[in-house]
Structures are given as structure tokens and as C-alpha cells.
């Protein structure tokens, strides 16, 4: 069974419903390798990576999709990005001493808020906000789509610190089925079947097996899988631009406080970018941002 990181789309030929499945191993492992997350945090972060990848697969755009959850609990921040090029990255901030071994989403992130942002290269930025309610992230996202003016969409998510998996079903505008009652009956039928899939099966089975297990009596068209990879968009140039935005006076003050070298660390991948006095002088002289080579923690 192949576990290569991928998203795979499928359609039901006899009704107006499409689906997407996501499988993340290597990219999920690379995200977790950057920080020593407790197991419950790693699991929730994996579910968010799968969810963002699923959502990105339903959109036709050139840009970035961001899922961000904030709370007043042990995990004040979870943030995941997926680009239209199917590149993912993610991070979490947490207080380890207050996290139980079996803590769920509501224990980790009480009174939380989930923000979905679609930021296209061209066009208008979209943002939706919903309370982080429900037993788990899949229920929260499903409730968000049910309560907003979006296409009805359901999610099934699971992660175990090694593999993150997701299944999405989305009802499309009326085409094959025009009758509202027939559309609703078809939607309820397909989602009810998906509800019989256990979390263990979602993690253990490949896409074709999952679809056969659920929909062997339906006509399902499975498309070619699309690769997903971990990629961090940080760069020395972006770090230099951040310093320029601070202004020369603040940068010179930082140089004094940091004993002659400013370091900027990427919170996603732990890459560190160093700028000495000569680099800072070049930035504000308009001579570019080239300087010492990058080093890691």
C-alpha cells in the first residue's frame, strides 16, 4: 500500500456530490520534526494539515489557504497553510505542563475560534470565522459549512503522529438531480455511509479500499492523485524585508541589544537568518539583502 503524500478527488456519477481524500506522512513528519509536540497536539495538528489540504483541493485558485485556531487553553494557537501548489506547513504553540495524555480538542482549546482564510494572488481575500465547537475538528468544520452560505460539506479526519488522513464530501450545485428532495436524500445517503467509517479504518486503508468499503454499490469515478509536500516559504529576502519595515533606527537598536547581530527565526521550520551591522547598512542603503550564509538551530 502506497503512503506517498497525496490528495485524490472522486465524483459520484449519478448525483451531485464530489469527494476528496488526503494522505499525509512525510510532510506531516517534517512538520512534527521541527518541534517536540506532545501527542495530543501532534494529532490535532495533523488533522488540521489534512483539513487544509482537503479544502485546498476543492478550490480553483492561485494562492494560499490558511486555517488558524486560537484559544485561551493549553494550545493558544494552531496554524496550517496549504498553497494552490499543494505545499503545506504548520505549527502549534502550547503549554506542555497542562496537557493530558488523552486530551481532545475541547480540552486543548477551550473557547476557541477557528479562522479560514483564502488569500488568492489575484482577487479578493476571503475570511470566515467560527467558534471551535464540536467533539472534534471534523465536526467543527462540518458545522461551519452547514451554518454558512457555502456548499454543504462534511469532513472525516484522523491523525496519530505518524500519518494524517482526511475524507471530504461536498454537495455540488444541482445538475444531475434537480429535485430538492432527491438531492437531499442522496446527500444524506452518502454521508451516512461515510459515518460508518471508523477512525482506525481511515488511517489504515488506502483510498480505493475506503471507497469500495463505503460505496461499492455506487458509481464512483476516482481521479489521479496529486502530490502534497512540506515546504516553508520563509526566506532571507522576506526576513530582510521585515527588518526594513521596522526602520533603520530600530534595527540599529536591535544590533546593540543583540551584540552586533540580529537573528530572525522562522516559527514554522526553525530556520534562522542572521544579519550583522554590514547587512543592516546594506538594507537601508538599497544594496540588497545578501549577507552571511543561513544557519539552523
Curated annotation (Swiss-Prot):
Domain of life according to the entry: Bacteria
GO MF term set: protein folding chaperone; unfolded protein binding
Presence of the UniProt keyword Metal-binding in the record: no
GO biological process, one term: protein refolding
Gene Ontology CC terms: cytoplasm
Major subcellular site: cytoplasm
Record keywords: Chaperone, Cytoplasm, Disulfide bond, Redox-active center, Stress response, Zinc
Protein task: Redox regulated molecular chaperone. Protects both thermally unfolding and oxidatively damaged proteins from irreversible aggregation. Plays an important role in the bacterial defense system toward oxidative stress.
Protein family membership: Belongs to the HSP33 family.
HAMAP family: HslO
Name of the protein: 33 kDa chaperonin
Organism name: Pseudomonas aeruginosa (strain LESB58)
